[in-house]
């Protein structure tokens, strides 16, 4: 399977309308051109892959190993280095844009990291049931309960691996399959992808060819929005007060008295 992919940054979500008045939720991904920083082959590395670098930064912001890596290959320094397996056919140093890899309506798989929620209990992490809140239930209303496998006899006197317990929740790699490309914004370097993508705003996103719907393209036509220019009204003429030097005779009489 010919694999094509590009890395970007999640900006946020919005919505867009088609010609059939269908409202599509979309995720906006900022995708600047990815640079081919390395090529791996079966003959040398036992597998095919393409190493991509993205998000341009000043060379001083990189550590010494990355500075040496880019200076040795005489490439533009980037903050991130990521590898995509089974991606072939690109020359070293080439800049890849999303318009070169995908078409509007093409199905893609999007990989990203979910939001990190820190150390949480079993109720939030695994959707366990809350304990009874009354009738002498005592203090542990939100505890996970017993974790042992059994009591004596032939039952195992240990806790099995993979037992659902309290622990670190979130910050896991998730792939959303069978989304499709809605559109491109070449000026602002944006890619519009249908549906929701896991992770926070500013998280790294990988857009790759769909594994299940390979080569399939969805027929999509967006509604063209026409905006009428506002009609400017002529400003109203302000009435100017004419100052006169005439003196009121009553005021002068009061002053003389």
From Swiss-Prot:
Keyword Ribosomal protein tagged: yes
Highest taxon in the source lineage: Bacteria
A GO molecular-function descriptor: structural constituent of ribosome
Region (Disordered): 232-257
InterPro entries: Ribosomal_L3_dom_3_arc_sf, Ribosomal_uL3, Ribosomal_uL3_bac/org-type, Ribosomal_uL3_CS, Transl_B-barrel_sf
Any one Pfam family match given in the protein's UniProt record, by short name: Ribosomal_L3
Function: One of the primary rRNA binding proteins, it binds directly near the 3'-end of the 23S rRNA, where it nucleates assembly of the 50S subunit.
UniProt keyword annotations, A-Z: Ribonucleoprotein, Ribosomal protein, RNA-binding, rRNA-binding
Any GO CC annotation of this UniProt entry: cytosolic large ribosomal subunit
GO BP terms: translation
HAMAP family: Ribosomal_uL3_B
Family label: Belongs to the universal ribosomal protein uL3 family.
Assembly description: Part of the 50S ribosomal subunit. Forms a cluster with proteins L14 and L19.
This protein's name: Large ribosomal subunit protein uL3
């Amino acid at each position: 399977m010919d694999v094509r992919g590009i890395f970007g940054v999640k900006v946020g979500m919005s919505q867009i309308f088609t010609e059939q008045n269908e409202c599509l939720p979309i995720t906006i991904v900022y995708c600047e051109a990815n640079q081919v920083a390395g090529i791996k082959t079966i003959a040398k590395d036992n597998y095919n892959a393409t190493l991509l670098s993205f998000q341009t930064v000043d060379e001083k912001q990189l550590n010494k190993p990355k500075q040496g890596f880019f200076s040795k290959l005489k490439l533009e320094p980037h903050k991130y280095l990521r590898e995509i397996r089974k991606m072939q056919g690109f020359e070293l140093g080439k800049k890849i844009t999303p318009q070169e890899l995908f078409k509007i309506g093409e199905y893609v798989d999007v990989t990203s990291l979910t939001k990190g929620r820190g150390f949480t209990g079993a109720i939030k992490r695994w959707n366990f049931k809350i304990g009874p809140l009354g009738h002498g239930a005592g203090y542990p209303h939100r505890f996970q309960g017993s974790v042992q496998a059994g009591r004596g006899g032939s039952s195992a006197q240990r806790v099995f691996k993979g037992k659902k317990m309290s622990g670190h929740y979130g910050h896991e790699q998730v792939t959303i399959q069978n989304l499709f490309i809605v559109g491109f914004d070449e000026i602002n370097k944006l890619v519009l992808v249908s549906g929701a993508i896991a992770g926070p705003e500013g998280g790294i996103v990988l857009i790759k060819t769909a594994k299940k719907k390979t080569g399939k393209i969805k027929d999509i036509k967006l509604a063209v929005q026409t905006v009428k220019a506002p009609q400017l009204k002529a400003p109203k003429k302000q009435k100017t007060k004419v100052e006169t030097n005439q003196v009121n005779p009553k005021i002068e009489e009061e002053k003389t008295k």
